[in-house]
Structure formats: structure tokens, C-alpha cells
């Protein structure tokens, strides 16, 4: 990054640790180590990691026009479907004074998530099935924000069950259309999902194409 580049801070997001420079998104980090081969750069004497939109859906949503990113620096975040830690590492960056609980059911990606947590003191991995929030609720004091990225047919019900258990104020849901039903029209599946989520205060629905086909990122207040 040249010294002449001036970062354009994303519009009125609550969290100032996210910046966008032209078609790239970055998170300010206290842990300047690559997690998945991303670029690390210095801007105004601060260290940033590039947030790859082809590897992480919130970055894709930002580039596709997401206006509100409701995660604050001291929030407690419950992340369902944490996988190997690509996206949750950026959530860890933007919540340096917060706590991030990452739930992952598969052992192989969980082992990588566990390695990541050894380098980040605000990240707590949980090896459990998000279908059963009662199995890990004892570990979690409170939740401000819930983020879900799970490829299961009942992904909406998983989201609602965890909202009922943890009562977060705000939520992100990655809707994976083809995981719900592979043969039905995408618009029909999206409309059904919107009906199921109408009990919440829906804020934004962002199509993630071309970064992810038949994927949407939905933000809401509960």
C-alpha cells in the first residue's frame, strides 16, 4: 500500500476497524499473521489484513453494498459454523475488546480453529453441533451478535433456535439457497426464508453474487 493511498472508511458502520480502499476491504489487526494467505499491509502506522470476498462472505457483502456492519469492538459474538477460521479471524480483528465464540461440528476444521485461537485471546472454539444450543449454552455468558454460516437444510431453524437460546440483539445469517432445496427456484426459497425471518426486524438482504452464487447475507435486529 503506497503512502499516498487514503483509506475510505466504510459508511456509517459502528466499527471503525473496517476500511475499504477501492475494491478491497481490510480489518485492522492486533495479530499481524496470515490466516489463509491474505495480504497484510500498513496504513497510517496501523496493521491491516485484507478481507478476501471470495473466501469470506461479509467482505463480499460489503463490496456488494452492505451499509451497516453491526459488530462493535467490545461485542460478544456467537459464530455458528466457524469452520477453519477464515471469517472468524476477521471478526476477532474488529472485536479486540470483545469475545468470540466459534461453534464448529467437524473435527478437522475445528483443529485448525483451535490452532488459530492459541494466537488470539478473544477467540473461544466450541466443538459442538449448532442444532443443539443447549449443549454449549453453559459456556457462553451473553451474546450481543450472532453470525451463522451453515450449509444445512434446516439452517433457518438452527438460527431461530440459537436466537431463542442466547437472545442476541443483532444477527447475521448467510442463507445458502441450494442447501435448503436444490431443485426449487432461488427466488421462491428466498421469499420463504424472508417469511420465516419476519418475526425479526430485517435490515439488509445482500446478494453475494459474483463471489458466491445463490448465497445471501441477511442482517437483522432481534
UniProtKB/Swiss-Prot annotation:
GO molecular function, one term: RNA binding
UniProt keyword list: Methyltransferase, RNA-binding, rRNA processing, Transferase, tRNA processing
Gene3D superfamilies: Vaccinia Virus protein VP39 (3.40.50.150)
Residues bound to S-adenosyl-L-methionine: 86-87, 104-105, 129-130, 149-152
Parts forming coiled coils: none
Signal as UniProt keyword: no
One of the GO BP terms on file: tRNA processing
The UniProt record lists the keyword Oxidoreductase: no
One Pfam short name: Fibrillarin
EC number(s) on file: 2.1.1.-
Root EC class: transferase
Subunit organization: Interacts with nop5. Component of box C/D small ribonucleoprotein (sRNP) particles that contain rpl7ae, FlpA and nop5, plus a guide RNA.
Function noted in UniProt: Involved in pre-rRNA and tRNA processing. Utilizes the methyl donor S-adenosyl-L-methionine to catalyze the site-specific 2'-hydroxyl methylation of ribose moieties in rRNA and tRNA. Site specificity is provided by a guide RNA that base pairs with the substrate. Methylation occurs at a characteristic distance from the sequence involved in base pairing with the guide RNA.
Record-stated family: Belongs to the methyltransferase superfamily. Fibrillarin family.
Family annotation (HAMAP family): RNA_methyltransf_FlpA
PANTHER family, per database record: FIBRILLARIN (PTHR10335:SF17), RRNA 2-O-METHYLTRANSFERASE FIBRILLARIN (PTHR10335)
Name of the protein described by the UniProt record: Fibrillarin-like rRNA/tRNA 2'-O-methyltransferase
Organism: Thermoplasma volcanium (strain ATCC 51530 / DSM 4299 / JCM 9571 / NBRC 15438 / GSS1)
Amino acid at each position: 500500500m503506497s503512502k499516498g493511498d487514503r483509506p475510505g472508511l466504510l459508511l456509517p458502520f459502528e466499527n471503525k476497524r473496517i476500511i475499504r480502499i477501492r475494491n478491497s476491504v481490510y480489518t485492522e489487526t492486533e495479530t499481524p499473521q496470515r490466516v489463509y494467505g491474505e495480504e497484510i499491509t500498513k496504513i497510517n502506522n496501523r496493521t491491516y489484513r485484507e478481507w478476501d470476498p471470495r473466501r469470506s462472505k461479509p467482505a463480499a457483502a460489503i463490496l456488494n453494498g452492505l451499509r451497516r456492519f453491526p459488530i462493535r469492538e467490545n461485542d460478544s459474538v456467537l459464530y455458528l459454523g466457524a469452520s477453519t477460521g477464515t471469517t472468524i479471524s476477521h471478526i476477532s480483528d474488529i472485536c479486540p475488546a470483545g469475545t468470540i465464540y466459534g461453534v464448529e461440528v467437524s473435527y478437522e476444521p475445528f483443529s485448525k480453529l483451535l490452532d488459530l485461537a492459541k494466537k488470539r485471546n478473544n477467540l473461544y472454539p466450541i466443538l459442538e453441533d449448532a442444532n443443539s444450543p443447549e449443549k454449549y449454552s453453559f459456556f457462553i455468558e451473553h451474546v450481543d451478535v450472532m453470525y451463522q454460516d451453515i450449509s444445512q437444510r434446516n439452517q433457518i431453524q438452527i438460527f431461530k433456535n440459537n436466537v431463542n437460546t442466547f437472545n442476541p440483539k443483532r444477527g447475521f445469517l448467510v442463507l445458502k439457497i441450494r442447501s435448503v432445496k436444490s431443485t426449487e427456484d432461488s427466488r421462491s426459497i428466498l421469499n420463504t426464508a424472508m417469511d420465516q425471518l419476519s418475526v425479526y426486524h430485517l435490515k439488509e438482504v445482500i446478494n453475494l453474487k459474483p463471489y458466491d452464487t445463490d448465497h445471501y447475507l441477511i442482517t437483522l435486529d432481534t
